[in-house]
Swiss-Prot record:
GO terms for biological process: L-leucine biosynthetic process. It comes from the Bacteria. It comes from Gloeobacter violaceus (strain ATCC 29082 / PCC 7421). This is 2-isopropylmalate synthase. Catalyzes the condensation of the acetyl group of acetyl-CoA with 3-methyl-2-oxobutanoate (2-ketoisovalerate) to form 3-carboxy-3-hydroxy-4-methylpentanoate (2-isopropylmalate). It is an enzyme of class 2 (transferase). Its EC number is 2.3.3.13. One of its GO terms (cellular component) is cytoplasm. Its cofactor is Mn(2+). Residues 406-538 are annotated as: Regulatory domain. It catalyses: 3-methyl-2-oxobutanoate + acetyl-CoA + H2O = (2S)-2-isopropylmalate + CoA + H(+). Gene3D superfamilies: 1.10.238.260, 3.30.160.270, Aldolase class I. Mn(2+) binds at residues 15, 206, 208, 242.
């Protein structure tokens, strides 16, 4: 099936959430889905409906909230098993346009050691389950898992059977990120040349980044006939991650003259090669990073803090004279507004609200009031408040779960010599204020021990990191942490000019998520109802 543009299939909420420690609750998934819709993705893979009640709820809520007539296609993953497919069909039912994505392994190593089935059995199952899914929706995607290590001739026959049974998209996963661009491009070319009926389906690819080749392999696939790319925001995902949405989109945007002829267009065509609103890329990256607790490395292409920074004097001189000397894209193209309008302590609510709208944030009255109070507090501490600061405040104040425990006060005493001591005052779910103190190896350790004495939620702190929001001695610091309890991970995030305060708030943010998960196990995902399902991943 020929397409003159690329279909962007976003799997941040499914494969991306499989990143270690990237657990999201249903509210957070809906918030990300809303932003993905604003970003302009064609398909949102909202989850694996059969895996757990929490996954089912998240897929259903995304379908109901974002799956409008003019919104993206909402998809659920399903093994090639009737119960999986039925759950997927039920979960995506509220969407105006739904898709079932079913899969089964086709590599000999998977058939022998995981499925314990013959090639003939797997081929028959693939055809039967695609036909079964077709009974629920017209839009059915089929994936031969571990296609990259499957025997080509057998892979061709399985794809033929899936297309004959009604698959409208056939997705080729490099499940373990093993192939090189030349090999993967050759695999896609072989499919276009040897699979009967391939013209009736869209060829999709799903590349993992184990060797750092996910984007390169995806581009090679496009050159050889693929017209859908499965990707995630910030490239998050299982193990080393997936193909990065922002990198694949901007590669096509910046190198449009190279890719236009591949899509059957004149080389000088200025029509975008995807439906993505690139100005939403940076905001999408920040939101996913904030909600998953997965920091973006500074040198990450497109969205890293250093992506548009120049340290070399020669480079700086060239950029000052003409940005094109050392930059191949404009930062504003991806939503990084370099004309950072500065607000101060005399700026009023209307100016603050107006700037939020210009930055792409639309807050309700309650969120706006909290954010404005934080802004005024910050403006009293800093001479000027930049857009970077405002974005950090917004990320901090938009709460998708109830704030059961609220920080009222934190004081620390430390120095050399001396024993770091912290006093913490909290308000609990019952509205009662509690105070306690503790000593630790450092001020943050003392604060966390004091909080643990006040909140009896056993957990293991597995990650703590601090990043500067802006330059300067009065810069805000962003603290991101992760805690683990019973195999589940919860992230916390906070920003403040005082790192100790930010650390306390980040820890409470994570503990509030943990508290909410224990009180609402279905809403937050809870234990997997079908762990065998979640164990199989593209």
């Amino acid at each position: 099936m020929f397409q003159d543009r690329l279909i962007i299939f976003d799997t941040t909420l499914r494969d991306g959430e499989q990143s270690p420690g990237a657990t999201l609750n249903a509210d957070e998934k809906v918030e990300i889905a809303r932003q993905l819709a604003r970003l302009g993705v064609d398909v949102i893979e909202a989850g694996f409906a059969y895996a757990s009640p929490g996954d089912f709820e998240a897929v259903e809520r995304v379908a109901r909230t974002v799956g409008t007539e003019d919104g993206p296609v909402i998809c659920s993953l399903a093994r090639a098993i009737r119960s999986d497919i039925q759950a997927a069909a039920e979960a995506i039912r509220p969407a105006a346009r739904g898709r079932i994505h079913t899969f089964i392994s086709t590599s000999d190593i998977h058939l022998e050691h995981q499925l314990r089935k013959s090639r003939a059995e797997v081929l028959a199952i693939a055809a039967e389950m695609v036909a079964f899914a077709k009974g629920f929706v017209d839009d059915v995607e089929f994936s031969p898992m571990d296609a990259g290590r499957s025997a080509p001739e057998y892979l061709y026959r399985v794809l033929e059977a899936a297309i004959a049974a009604g698959a409208t998209t056939v997705n080729i996963p490099d499940t373990v990120g093993y192939l090189t661009p030349a090999e993967f491009g050759g695999l896609i070319r072989g499919i276009t040349q040897n699979v009967r009926g391939i013209e009736r389906a869209v060829i999709s690819v799903h590349c993992h980044n184990d060797l750092g080749l996910a984007v390169a392999n995806s581009l090679a696939a496009i050159e050889n006939g693929a017209r859908q790319i499965e990707c995630t925001v910030n490239g998050i995902g299982e193990r080393a991650g997936n193909c990065s949405l922002e990198e694949i989109v901007m590669a096509l945007h910046v190198r449009r003259q190279f890719f236009n002829p591949i899509f059957g267009r004149p080389a000088d065509s200025t029509v975008p090669l995807s439906t993505i609103d690139t100005r939403q890329i940076y905001k999408s990256s920040r939101l996913v990073s904030h909600l998953t607790g997965m920091l973006v490395q500074p040198n990450k292409a497109i969205v890293g803090a250093n992506a548009f920074a120049h340290e070399s004097g020669i480079h700086q001189d060239g950029v000052l004279k003409n940005r094109l000397t050392y930059e191949i894209m404009d930062a504003e193209t991806v939503g990084v507004n370099e004309n950072r309008i500065v607000l101060g302590k005399h700026s009023g609510r209307n100016a603050f609200r107006t700037r939020l709208v210009e930055l792409g944030y639309e807050l309700g009255d309650a969120d706006l009031n909290r954010a404005f109070l934080r802004f005024k507090e910050l403006a009293d501490k800093k001479k000027t408040v930049s857009d970077w600061d405002i974005e950090a405040v917004i990320s901090d104040e938009i709460r998708l779960i109830p704030e059961a425990y609220r920080l009222e006060q934190v004081q620390v005493s430390c120095g050399e010599p001396g024993l770091p001591t912290a006093t913490v005052r909290l308000t609990g779910p019952d509205g009662v204020e509690r105070v306690d103190a503790a000593v630790g190896t450092g001020p943050v350790d003392a604060v966390y021990k004091a909080i643990n004495r006040l909140i009896e939620l056993p957990n293991e702190l597995i990650e703590f990191s601090v990043q500067s929001v802006t330059a300067g001695i009065d810069a805000m610091g962003e603290v991101t942490i992760r805690v683990r309890q019973d195999g589940r991970t919860f992230s916390g995030h906070a920003a403040n000019t005082d790192i100790i305060v930010a650390s306390a708030r980040a820890y409470l943010n994570a503990l509030n998520k943990l508290h909410f998960a224990l009180a609402h196990p279905t809403h937050s995902g809870g234990a997997l109802a079908h762990p065998d399902a979640a164990a199989q991943k593209l």
